Each structure stands twice: as C-alpha cells, then as structure tokens.
Amino acid sequence: MLGSLMKSGVEITNDAAQADALIVNTCSFIDSAQEESVDTILESVELRDANRRGQAVIVSGCLSQRFREELPKLLPEVDAFMGIDQVARVGDIVGKAIASRAEKNGNEKLKIKNSKTKISARLNELEKNRDLSAREKEESLRGTDKFGKTKTVVAASRESAANLSLAEGTAAFSRNAATIFDVTSRPVFIPDFETPRFRLTPKHFAYLKIAEGCNHPCSFCIIPRMRGSHRSRTQKDIVAEAKALIADGVKEINLISQDSTYYGLDLRPNHSRAISSPEKFSAAAKSLAADATTICSLLRELNSIKGDFWIRLLYTHPAHWTDELIQTIADCKKVARYVDIPLQHIHENMLERMRRETSQQYIVDLIQKIRAGIPGIALRTTFIVGFPGETESSFETLLDFVRETKFERLGVFTYSQEDGTLAGKMAGQIPDKVKQKRRELVMAAQHKIARQVSENFVGREIKVLVEGQANEKQLQQANVSSWEHGLIREAETSKLQIQNYLIARGEADAPDIDGRIYIRGRLPIGEFAKVKIIGHTDYDLIAEPVA
C-alpha cells in the first residue's frame, strides 16, 4: 500500500496532524483486533473533527472486507472504504476521499457521534445472525458423534441482518453520496514483482509473499472469507523479486502466505479447491508433471540464486507436507533448518472439530520424518487451548504431547470465540479462566523445554545474522544482566554492558516471534557472523564472536 501511494506521488508522513488523509488499515481476525480497529477509526475521526475538519479518513483492510455492506452505514463519518483488491489503486482513492471530505464539510447534517461500544456490538450481532448454508450446518457437526463428548448446536432461529435497525447510520449514508465505497465481494488481488514496494523491515531481511488466501475449512478461522481462495504467484515472478531483494543487500528471505505448503497446486489445470486432507494432497502432488510449480520447485530455484542468504519457510500446513518437501529442505543449504508448522492440537476429537484434516498419528509420524530427514531442524508450532469441547482428558493429551515432543519453539493461544465461524456457534465453550490456566500449564512445560534447548547450544559455534545494538530494555527483559552475575541476583545493566552487546538471530529464530542471541563484542550490523555460545537465559542465548 505504501509503495502504491508513493508511486502515485502521495507524500507519506508519520505526523497525523499534518496529513491530508489518514488511512486506518484494519484487522478483523479476532474480536479484540476488531475492537481495536473500531477504536482507532473513531479516535481518528474525533481528532479530525477537533483539529482538522478537511482531513479525510479512509478505512482499509480486513474490517472493510468482512463487513463491506454494513460498515459504511455504521460509520458515515468515514470518507472512504477500500478492500483488499483496491490496494494498487489507493492513490486514486485518497484523492477522491479528500474531495469527499470537502463536500461533507458543507453539509452540517452529517455530524454524527458514534459509540465504539455500539459499533463493536453491532458488528458482532451481524455475524451471529449470518445465515449458515446447509453445507455449513452439516460440517459444523463434524467430530462430535464419533467421540460423544460434546454436541454442536446451530441456532435455528435467525433474524435477517437486513431487518435489524440501522436507521441513523443508513439515513446518514444515503444522504452522503460523497462517501467512497470500493470493496469487492471476494478478493482476487495478489501482488507481483511489478507492484510498488516500500519495505518496513530492516535492510538485511524481508518478507516475500508467495501466495494469498486460503482453501482450508478450519472451523475457528475467518480468513478464507476475508482473504479469498488460495492463489499463488508464478514462480518466475517470485524468483525475480527474490533476486532484487538479494541485490539490495537482503540476507534473509522469509516466505509467507496463509498456507505456504499449498503453493503452486492451484496453478495446475482443472484445479479443485477440495484438496485439503493429506491423502488428497499427496495424490494431487504425485499427479503433477515433473516441471510443475510447487513449493519444492520454488525452494530449489531460490536456493540456486548466487549469494550468501537464508530462505525461511513460514506458515506451512501439516496436511500438505510430502517426503519430497523434506528431501528438498535437506538438500537446499540456504533454506534455514527451521520449520514453522502450526498444529493447533493433537487430540483426535479436537482436530476433527477444528477441521484440521489431520490425525494424531499422522502428526506424530510427520514430526518423526521431518526430524529424521532434516538433521538439526528446529520445529516451531502453535497450539490452541480451550477450544469448544476440550475436556480435561483431551487437554492432558495435548500437554503430554508437548512434553514428549520437545518443540524447539512453541506458542500457545487461548481460543477466541469468533462470530461468523463454525466454532463460534459450537456448544461446550470453555470459561476464560480455564482457558488461561491451560495456557499457563502448557507454557510452563515449554519453559523447561526451552531452557534445555538453550543449554544444548552452549559451547557450539553457529552462524548468526546480526540485527543491531541491544538497548537497556532488551537486555533487562532477557535477564542478561543476571546471567552476567552468575544468575545469583538481579543487577542493573551498566552502560558498559549496553555498549558491548549486539542482538542477532540464528537459523532457529524467525524475526519477531522467536528468541534472540546477545553477543558481547562488535560485529557488522546486517551481516552474517560466526559466534560461540557461552551461556543462556530462559529463551535467549549469550555469545561472543569467533576470532
């Protein structure tokens, strides 16, 4: 979006008070993100009305996409709404929104003060009353009868969203012909090499989107409705962007999408969306021509690019792993020895209710194959606790699995009941206190594992990517000063210590989500270096340069 704005000649500023237009890029993945988006929109409107009435407010992103029909009626104060497909035309939309604001300023009747609580409640109500198709109703019952633990209840009585009162907002919206509304019903946009870019990451690493959208039917997730079906970029296009990034000094390319392991399968002739289970995916992969585009062919071509850099594969789906992918990662030395594979649960009933298209035994076997086939691999995963119907027994199965598998990196989310999802309508919702307690138990188990993983690094020499100078807050959060004093007592980090520490990451650490390596000494920032691990804290390592 920033790249498209700059290409259009729009000047970017961090000072909201000086801007002619404010763009609120929203998230609507979970309720808390949705509420934060609404808060930010209304705060922007209040600041505009108090300080600069000529300033246009534009709402973009997932909230606009998810509530494309209702949001303009609920927020007539906003000057423009744009969806995911309109990113490349944002410059034109900004110009129209500024003109719209000028027209609105002449209409005093449009002064409406909205309540953020009222709007958030209304959006939740819209999703609760959304009619489910017959197929969705049938699918919502999956994984219940087999285990006999819980029942899914889909409300039979629904009030049409069109009949719910929106009198004030609808009236204002109908009077306001100047509001810009540009949101397609189902997104199809995907950036390519020609799409303008304005990178927000440091120069030494970048995210490279290889696909957009998702074909998976997970019962807890709203993403397919907001982002559309899975659609892959061409391999040629991705490789061209990767080469440009490497030429610009990038040392780490992080491949991202909603499902990276599905990459390329949608490009084959007569592609069907119903390729989600391991069996169907494996059969489809085997039927591909030798020169077909897949995640394996992409990794191999990226690996062949000249230069010293890492390729990191993020957001893989367990149902879409193949023996070929394991062999490809093992063969490609530039692909980081790191796998991001969100599993979400391990108990059979939970996997089926989540519609994860995998089984407990399949996951156990897959992890064994990955670890055997890629020596030195670091496994990162995430789990959801407190999903509807999660009994004490099914939770204990998950907890035992975490203790036994000993993931190098692990995150835990408490289930968030989302309107508009099948899981949001399921019976057996878990109290928040129970969900939080279960999260704490899993993280306590992982804390012990993480310390052991860190301890196993001590004495080793590894390759790292130097991120920058460590500041006092980072050193205190990592408890580095206590390590300096033999873990005997807390001690304030001295200025000398601050000046002497750098932050780096190893192959086992993705940006932002994993641990750090604190290096005592001086090394070039944004470059690879070899260090020796001399200590550790709970989740982080302490190192010194290898001469």
Residue spans of the language-model regions?
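Proteins enriched for Cys/Gly/acidic motifs involved in redox and nucleic-acid/cofactor modification
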Residues: 1-263, 324, 339, 362-372, ...
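Intrinsically disordered, low-complexity Ser/Thr- and acidic-rich flexible linkers and loops
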Residues: 112, 116, 137-138, 145, ...
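Conserved SAM/AdoMet-binding glycine-rich loop
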Residues: 57, 66, 247-395, 403
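Generic beta-strand/beta-sheet core signal
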Residues: 60, 223-224, 256-258, 314-316, ...
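Intrinsically disordered, low-complexity acidic Ser/Thr-rich regulatory segments
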Residues: 145-148, 161-182, 282-294, 303, ...
